[in-house]
From Swiss-Prot:
Keywords: Aminoacyl-tRNA synthetase, ATP-binding, Cytoplasm, Ligase, Metal-binding, Nucleotide-binding, Protein biosynthesis, RNA-binding, tRNA-binding, Zinc. Belongs to the class-II aminoacyl-tRNA synthetase family. Its cofactor is Zn(2+). Transmembrane segments: none annotated. Its main location: cytoplasm. Zn(2+) binds at H564, H568, C666, H670. This is Alanine--tRNA ligase. It is found in: Cytoplasm. SUPFAM superfamilies: Class II aaRS and biotin synthetases, Putative anticodon-binding domain of alanyl-tRNA synthetase (AlaRS), ThrRS/AlaRS common domain, Translation proteins. It comes from Rhodopirellula baltica (strain DSM 10527 / NCIMB 13988 / SH1). Binds 1 zinc ion per subunit. Catalyzes the attachment of alanine to tRNA(Ala) in a two-step reaction: alanine is first activated by ATP to form Ala-AMP and then transferred to the acceptor end of tRNA(Ala). Also edits incorrectly charged Ser-tRNA(Ala) and Gly-tRNA(Ala) via its editing domain.
Amino acid sequence: MKTDELREKYLAFFETKGCVRQPSDVLVPAWDPSVLFTPAGMNQFKDHFLGKVKLDFTRATTCQKCLRTGDIDNVGRTAFHHTFFEMLGNFSFGDYFKEEAIHWAWEFLTDKKWLGIPGERLTVTVYKDDDEAFGIWHDKIGLPTQRISRMDEDENFWPASAPSEGPDGVCGPCSEIYYQLEDGSDVEIWNLVFTQFNRVGTPPDNLHPLPSKNIDTGMGLERTASVLQGVPTNFHIDSLFPIVEAASEVCGVKYEYESDNGRRLRRITDHARASVFAVHENVYPGPKDARSVIRRLIRRAVLDGYQMNLREPFLYKLVEAVADASKAAYPELGQTTQRVSEAIESEEKAFFSTIDGGMKRIHRLFEEMNDEASVMVPGAEAADLLTTYGVPPELVQTLAAEQNFTFDWSGFREAMDKHADESDGGQRVLFQTGPLETLKEALRETPFVGYEQTEATAVVKGIITGDGKGKGDDGQLLSHLDRPEDAVLRLVLDHSPFYGESGGQVGDIGVISNDNFEFEVIDTQRHASMIVHHGRLIRGKINEGETCTAKVDVENRTALARAHSATHILHHALHTHVGRHAEQQGSKVEPDRLRFDFTNPKAIDDETLVKIEQDVLGMVGKGDEIRWDTVSLADAREAGAMMLFGEKYPDPCRMVSMGTFSRELCGGTHLTNTKQVGSFEVVVEESVSTGTRRIEALTGERAKEHREQTQALLNEVAGKLNCDASVAAAATVALIEEVRRLKKELSSGKAADYPAEFVFDAKAAKAETTDISDYNAVRAAVRGLTRRLNVAITDVLSRLDSLLADRSKLVEQLKQVTAGGKISADDLIADGTKVGDTLLIVAETPGANPNIMRGWIDQIRKKSDTPTAVLLASSMNDKVMLVGGLSRDLVDRGLKAGDWVGAAAKVVGGSGGGRPDMAQAGGKDASKLPEALQQARETMTEKLG
């Protein structure tokens, strides 16, 4: 049965059961901020399941486009995992329930009129306490007990483990249907979820029956198609294999199921399909949110191509194949193939330009590890390679193994947890009815009165424990709080002058109080239409319903307004000096500090930055009026107000105008006159991602302080480098290059003579000078310093200290290398001993780094005409480095260099390993090196004897 036929049969079958056929929801549901992508068929019905919205029908059926990345590492490796897939579903909103859902699933699967799957090939699971579902399967369907498995809540409850672990909200047991493959293994094809409980609190007795029970079922289209078509994987079904074949042709690689390239072609197929569907819906690859997921998918596919020796964009050539394979159900894909192809090709080009950078970064990392005698690739480094260059950890691990390094998976996962919210693809759908949702139903909204006033009399409407910043809000709604505590609480008032964080502007701070209590507000957030005050009760006790005074910190609010108004002025200046294409891509407004992201393909040079800054200061100095008006969207457009693409604006809306030069739709707080911005200073201009730049700037007193700090910095740098301030920037560059040169010489084993202290001869270097009387010249020099040192201005001096310390260590190590350089492979062979037919060499080689020691071992093995076992060691700065090698004939006898070196490393407080013929390790206790060498000598002598 073809995939298109299966899809239609499913929908038609459930139409015969009274279900209304509904279209697939979009991949990125703008109405649902809890997910990045639609992860399941029921997502579009969340509000209906919760009873918030009433439908004209109580039964529905859909085929939903879904995208998840939770199992991304399995894509291409397993038979059934995808990122993009289609989920067939049938739903009940307080209508049919368990018995009908089970009967209809069985009928559709086994009746010859529909799929005709032999019933004896099917087994089911139920939740261990769901006797009702067990009884239906056993007594009414007729399945024998041995084909019905009772499972724990982690397997057969939705959400998984909800009874014991939460979250609170709608939940229920589920029943899964499995098909037995020819090899005897089972594949899940259908999941029936019986949402019949509302979880409240901790067990026991925390599952309360819902007055209206619901059904949510899902059948994987691709999995079921593979079963019906009798193919080994989802990738071999009629709607996917043509894309696999197209990928094989485009990549110039034969498709073989079991090969590494076969896995790569399957992964390319999946990621191409996901990217085409997403970009078709205007989800372009980018740095944040859903866009970052699409970027990751495209880059993973490109890396697979890179490993098959492709060096030019290729993925975009599969767009037509994806559209053609999907045309029966999604003919609209064919209308946007050119736009989608161009977007994917552009991302490929950008990534191909960074792949080499990523590989160079890996090689530099390996060199540093050799220098430091490290044996494990740090997880944080691998995470940075993934997030910066898109290099997957699996590739890093493979390359590391070739260098006898291991890989820190736990550290990698810990580092990647910081990116989870933007990379997990929103794979879970939770019906959590937390305290804010409960409060919202009663309060509806919190009117904001802060445009007109910074102090207001209000009534406490909600007291909530916790800060609510985790993935699930487990806070409690209280009626009162009797004593102060350090934990963060949340207050909701009937109205508020506090601005809740939105539009890039951070929330207000201040105090909410009366005679009975004082609540310090440390942050203000928006939750839908409610303003939520985060803070601590520092005095007294607080009760719901009491009247209080909400007072915003005016000084902080004014500093925010300075930065926000300056952001609008900066936006105008960018249009003037960079171009109209420099549109806002994101912003953050903090007290007297702003961050503004905008579209631009290249860096802004210092000369243009000065012009932008002077233009902003000129508009500030004019003292134009800043005003805001509530207008209709139509009037705002007619007035030429700037609107951000893709942003949803209310109608009517708030338009902020500055003189005659700027009009933007904005809900933030502003000054009343541009002159109130005071000073303005650009401190950073940098890349955020391909095609997106970022400017950070300061306003008010912070800008003045930064200016003074900048003017003083060159003198401080000059003092550290013992040179004139006019050449301090050039001296810093010379120091960086000298440290790099020292590392290279140390790595290669070359020894040169360097003075103990850093000396910069400006005349000999023909150094470029800075006019220290010209602030713009000074600032340009300081910006150059921060770029070369890759630090903020506040960290320049500490980074210089670090570089000078590194230089001193490297010079000292080079002296040791000079001593070690007198050793040769012939010397080591001469000092070796014969154990049976084997030449055994165990020696300390002072000053030698792992590269040098590996070189000696290779030379010894080539020179020796007998079996050879070599272990060399050196120590620097109390760190021990060990490298061991065995000739091929010893490896064939079952000996392993990794075991030998690893045992010696334990003696010096370290660890290591590698290939059977070559391994290295590091240690922390240089005092025990003689003991380690003696043990290595005795261990190998015993093995050879």
